[in-house]
A protein has these predicted regions:
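Catalytic pocket-lining loop regions of alpha/beta-barrel enzymes
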Residues: 1-92
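Short, flexible micro-motifs
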Residues: 47, 97-98
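Mid-to-C-terminal alpha-helical segments outside catalytic/metal-binding sites
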Residues: 85-92, 99-137
Length: 137
């Protein structure tokens, strides 16, 4: 089963639709439902950063992150941080879309090479969906 949840960063500016579910609540959810694949909108409210902790990487094995809110929340440099963390394979574009026009994203995605862009735009989603049909957790 696959579920998309909206998450929000616990700090920073307020915006329409910003909720109160942050990284801590999202991590607890992943821990409680390890068999469920979860896409966290808004880059998981920063949850992905905790995947750099070995114990959290295990807990967050079922977590994926959507990039649709990236232009509202972060500088383009965040894509370099995601790459440095080795987590490109867990990021999706379009599961929480449309938020802005596609041109805004195209400028941001210039920070990615062709392989990374293809992963975010399609391959990661296909791999995730294929894992559901294969019964992987």
């Amino acid at each position: 089963m696959l579920l998309l949840l909206h998450t929000a960063e616990p700090v920073g500016h307020n915006y329409v639709g910003k909720g109160s579910v942050g990284p801590k609540e999202a991590a607890v959810f992943c821990s409680n439902y390890p068999e469920l694949k979860v896409i966290f909108a808004h880059l998981g409210g920063g949850l992905w950063l905790y995947e750099l902790m070995p114990e959290m990487r295990k807990i967050l094995a079922n977590a994926y992150y959507d990039l649709a809110a990236l232009p509202w929340l972060y500088e383009t440099k965040i894509l370099n941080a995601i790459k440095a963390a080795g987590l490109i394979k867990k990021f999706l574009f379009g599961s929480d879309f449309p938020i802005l026009n596609i041109q805004r994203y195209e400028k941001l995605f210039m920070a990615l090479n062709a392989e990374e862009l293809e992963a975010i735009k399609s391959c990661n989603a296909l791999n995730l969906l294929n894992s559901l049909t294969a019964g992987e957790t």
